[in-house]
Swiss-Prot record:
EC number annotated for this UniProt entry: 2.7.11.33, 2.7.4.28
PANTHER family: PYRUVATE, PHOSPHATE DIKINASE REGULATORY PROTEIN 1, CHLOROPLASTIC
Entry-linked InterPro entries: Kinase-pyrophosphorylase (IPR005177), PSRP (IPR026530)
Native source organism of the sequence: Albidiferax ferrireducens (strain ATCC BAA-621 / DSM 15236 / T118)
Its biological purpose: Bifunctional serine/threonine kinase and phosphorylase involved in the regulation of the phosphoenolpyruvate synthase (PEPS) by catalyzing its phosphorylation/dephosphorylation.
The protein's name in its UniProt record: Putative phosphoenolpyruvate synthase regulatory protein
Binding site for ADP: G153, V154, S155, R156, S157, G158, K159, T160
HAMAP family (alphabetical): PSRP
Amino acid sequence: MSQRTVFFISDGTGITAETFGNAILAQFETNFRHVRLPFTDSVDKAHQAVREINHAGIVDGNKSIVFTTLVDMEVLKVITDNCHGMVLDMFSTFVHPLESELNLKSSHRIGRFTDASKSSAYQSRIEAINFSLAHDDGQSNTDLEHSDIILVGVSRSGKTPTSLYLAMQYGLKASNYPLIPDDFERQQLPPALKAHKSKLFGLTIQPERLSEIRNERRPNSKYASLENCRMEVSEAEAMMRRSGIRWLSTTTKSIEEISTTILQEIRPERLAY
């Protein structure tokens, strides 16, 4: 199949257009060339975008696909009237019908993150990220009671990226704590976690995959050996079962899938949007 270029155009950061567009494109098993055009917030910039879109179509021999989140109708009109691509505008598709249904006018605010630094949701995210970094890999037991979620599991099972995703995406204070051989010998959770069992969620992983990941970090070590990985995973899963901790395998799941499952199970009281 010949190349097809996809443009993500916004008068803000373009994050919404790109997220929406990529979710749609993921349904099609083909490769696209991605071009981001954020801050397209004037007629002049819109005409420049049109030139890029039309040029890409000529080079590719195919219409470009254009995902937009443009609030300024004059800017959007330049795109829709002059470009030779297939234009998919989120606001025309969703916001305008909602205005009719709700009998309300939308704010038509440019950019999802306009004045974001002043919003409570933004501040919650910053606080959550700082908290999660301070409580990564059991670094600190201080204020552990303020965690919304505490992830537990063996080293390299996906705890850190999941904690940071929960903090950045939802403003949740997500701590994470490793389960190590000393815990397995005692056959008990780390003492610092016992008072917070309702907030615990376990992550596990197939030993073979864990060994691959660890060998990238510390090749040919006991830590990365398949035998050791099998032992740690088995002991960690047994401990989680004994302690009544909910858990899932991260082996074939994305960070987004892991986080969504955790939220369904834990159901924290607050989320920052």
